[in-house]
Structures are given as C-alpha cells and as structure tokens.
Amino acid sequence: MKISKTLFKNLTRCKNFSGYYDIYINRTFSNVKVVDNNINMNDLDNIDITSLDENTEILDSMFDEETGEDLLHVSNAQLEAFQSIYVEVEKLAIEYARSLFGDSIKSSEETKNQQYFEYITEENNYYCYLDGYQEEEDEVNIFEVKSTTSRKFDDLHLTLRTTKNYLGDKKALFIKNKKGIYDFVAYDYLGLEYNNKIITINDIEKAMEKLLDPYSDVGKYIYDVAIEKYIIENSSQNINKKVNYYLIVLNHEYTLENENCKYVIDKNGQSLFKVYNISIIVEKLHTEIAKKKEELEYNLRSLLINRNQIGKCCEYKKTTQCVFFPICWKKLREDGSILEFLNKRFMNKSDKTKSFNVFELANQNIYKIKDAYEYIYENNNYYQYKCIIENSEFIDKERTRWALSQIKYPIYYLDFESYNSPLPRFYGEHPYSQSLFQYSLHIEKEENVCNIEKNHKEYLAPDHLDHRIDLIKSLIKDIDLTNGGTVIVYNENFEKTRLKELAEIFPEYSRKLLNIRSHIFDLCQVLNGKGKMYMGDLLYQKNKKELPTFAFYNNNLHGSFSIKKVLPVFSDLTYSTLDVKNGTEAILTYGILPTLTEKEYQEKYLALRKYCRQDTWAMVEILWNLKKKADF
C-alpha cells in the first residue's frame, strides 16, 4: 500500500482506523476479521442477524445505499475559502527562507515537482513531498511551511513553581539567533539555577509535552515533520549528511504597514514569517514514529474493529477530525448524549479519588446524560441532568430579570462579519486578523417597537478594497449614544475586540469607537452566566453554590449557547431558507465576490445582507421572548 504522510497520521490514530479504511476503500467486509468482537461478516454460517445488521450499518454510514454517494467526505470550508492564499503563503515562505539560507532551496507550487522521498518495506511504500529542500556540501536543510501563526510556539515556556501559588519567571523554549532563526534552547537550561531551584531533565520534558503530543495545537506540526524525518532516514536515497529540520510559520507579531509594498519588515523589525529549528524535537520522536509504523503494519494485517476506542485521537470538532467519526461516535451524536454536558469532567460518587473525561465514560458504554448520574459532581451538569430526566426547562427568573434591568433604551443590536485572511490585507492588520467587511444593526428605540426592515441599518463592503473607514463612519453615524443606550451583541469578545482593534489602527475615531464598546451588553451571558454579567447580582452571589452558572437551559440547546442553537428555543425564525446560512458561508461568499458576473454578484451581495440582518433580528426575538419567559 502507498502511504502518504497524511495517511500515516490517520492509520496511527487508533486500531480501528485500518479496519474502517479497508471497508471504505473496498466497500466490503471481505478483509475485516472482527467487528465489535463479532464473527467475520463473511462467515455467514456462524453469524447471527444482529451481527449482520450491525456490520451493514457501518457500510451504510459510509455510502448512500441507493446512490452510492460518499457520506463521509466533508469539504473543509476554510481550505476552500483561502486555498489560493495558502499557495501564496508557501511561495512567500520559501522566498523568506532563501533570504536566510540562500537561493539553492528547491521548491515548487506543484507537489509532483517537489523533492520526493520514499521508504519501501515488504508491505508498504511510505512517501513524502517536501515544501523546501536544500542540499549543501556538509548538510541538508528541510523546510516545512504551515499556514498557522507563531503565537502558539512563542507562548511555550519552561516555568518552575517557586511557591504553591507563584510560578515565577518564564524561560522561552525558542530564542532567535543572529541569523534570524528561532532555535530550540530548552536543553541549554539544564543544570542552571532558576528561582532558587536547579533545572532538571524532568522540568525540560514537562515543558516539551505539548511539542511531543501529535494532537496538541503545536505538536501536530512537529509530528508532521517527524514522519518526514523517519521516511527520509529510511529511504534508499542515502543522504549521509547532517539533516536540519525547519518549520516556517506566519509571524503573529507582524503588522502590515504599506499595502503597495507588501510584506517588507515592519517598523518593529518583524518579518512576515518566523523559522523554527525543530531538529532536536523531531529527533525525540524518532523512536515513537518507528513504533507507530510497526503498529500501523500490524493493524493493516489484522484489521480489527472495536467501537470502544474513542479518545482525543478522534480530534472531535477540529478541522482534522477523523473521517470515521460519524461511525465511532454514532451513539454520542444522539440527542441527550454526554457530549451535551457543559462540564466534561466527571467523578464517580462512590470513588472521588478518580476523575473521568467524556471519552472514558463513553468507552464504558455510558452514552446518555440520563445514565451518568453517578458521575455528576457539579451544579451545571446536575441541572442539565434534571432537565433531561424531567423533560423540563430551567430558568432562574430572578437572576434573568436582574440582568435585563441593566438594559437601557435605545437598544442597538449589533453584529459584525469579518474575513480572517492568512495574509494581512490592509494597513495595521496581522496574519489572520479578523478584517471587518460588514455590520448589521437593528434599532429598538422603545420597548418592543422594532421592525425587521424599517428599523434596520447596515454596511457591506462592495469589494475587496479597504473600506474600513467607510464602515467606521457609518457605524458611528448609526449608533447614537448621545443620550445613553445599550449596544446588544451575542458573545461580546468578538465585537469588543474588533472595536478595540479599529480604535488602535484609526486613532482619529478611537474615542467614538471605544464609547460604543463601553456600552456593549452580551445577550449570551444573560443565558450562560459567564463573564461579569452577574457579578453585581448580590442575591445570586449569595446563593451561587447551590445554583448552576447558567440562568437558562433547555434540552434543545444540546449543551451549546451558540445563537444558532438558542434561536429555535425562542423563535420560529430559521436560517435554513437563506442562501448564506452561517458565518463560514459568509466568508466563502465574500471571498468570491470579485470573481462573479454582475448578476451573480448582486445575488450574493443580497444574500450576505440578508444573512447578517438575520443575526441581529435573531437577537431581537431572543430578547423579547426571554422577557416573556422571565415575566419581565
């Protein structure tokens, strides 16, 4: 079998992947030896109807029975939206590497033309293509480009606890050298005295845990390169030179200053990219990769499937979520599953020395909230359990009324839409800045007097040029806080952060933008109780040990307070009839505007306007109906 780097990562997720992959590729159980410890489906003389149904169900979960359509393939919307930009990132990253290492780095935008290595065994052919490859007289440099940012790497530190509550100063794991490359320096600290303690190998290994974890936000990139290293070192193309491994990522500290002369070093001396020397780290993973390769080959030979194998390797809700997630997690995707618990740590009431995560409960065949009572130890989960058992709705009317009493008229319901391009587009932006291109505003001057069309204001950038000042001017004009008022948003972190960013980039509008920011009221916090919403509610503060954090809960929320989940509980309003149905589709639609015909453009432009308007009108309906439920 030909096994790419990506397939290697998938086949080593868990023992089940190989069996499911064989079924998926061949559309048959002919090679699978065990399914949930039942007899092979092909041994029809010894199989009962229950086993047959169970196995057919797996195949039916992969392909539509009538059309044969692949039910597991889900497109990556973010990848689609920014595909051309990712290509540009790789191109610019290699250009930057050449400025540091010389022009001899081999690279290509076409994968087939990149440097290729393969490792052939009796059973499989492991192969990889390299983003950048440079062979010098005494050494080889290998470059992997990732369209992520440097923040997660720069945030890694070695920290020693000096007292029970004080961690002391931090020591960075990566430090920039004279050539502008970030070296891994953790081992340089070994034996040094730090905060009156001697740094030991255990301290260093503790600091490296995330780097060596293939499922952490930094470790997954290291693991990628470690697989490349294993293939290269075992390939027939003997290098016989020292090999250095480098990871190139976007610099989160870089600020675009001149749109006409893009990506030059900014005024703070920051480049668009950072290069990390990860040679020492991938060497630490060499034995682990070799072990994984042996497990992979054993699993491909045995093709065993056991449903009770879920864990962080499934990468639940990540863009890298396992393709077979719908099969393994089927019982957990049903209404009322333990995935809906707001707190996903559990403790057995009869043995409070051990805690469990949601994976461990599921692997013990506990899938439903109603069956998890013995493992509930905190208020949020208990009240969710109570709502399920009693089929009831929870609302803390007194607390909700207290929150609603903070709202002053006129009310401005505000929602932003943004485009988080990997490459900064406009002055003052960083990689992945949430660049605003649209807002929607519903205005309720008097209580319960607001019309979806008549009392609506909006702004939508007509193209991909910089229209932020136009948006700011329009926003300031539409939100009149001269005589007070409230700006209602849903999840304040987003709107507050965007307003603060605009105020910093355009200081001439800072005072008015920050005034809008200071009047923000988070409708989501009224429901979920997070943030500072109820800190001033003295009655709640007195009784909160007996109450859940949230002030409202309905089983139809399914453990989420997102506006898409909350809206159906309070209103018949739906997004299903809209051409643009969610934020991801809004990004995709905005992204393609310059490529459309005039007719297509008008249709998509209108679709974006309707979608954003729906978000603010949804807040209107939620607030009005919440008032009724709270008798306010």
Model region roles, listed by residue range:
Residues 319-425, 429-433:
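Long, internal scaffold/assembly segments composed of regular secondary structure
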Residues 90, 94-99, 142-144, 149, ...:
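Conserved RNase H-like, two-metal-ion catalytic cores of nucleic-acid enzymes
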Residues 112-116, 129, 134, 138, ...:
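Conserved DEDDh/DEDDy metal-dependent 3′-5′ exonuclease domain
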Residues 49-66, 158-213, 268-281, 285, ...:
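Charged, glycine/proline-rich intrinsically disordered loops and linkers
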Residues 1-142, 148-186, 343-380, 386-393:
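Metal-dependent nuclease catalytic cores that hydrolyze phosphodiester bonds in DNA/RNA
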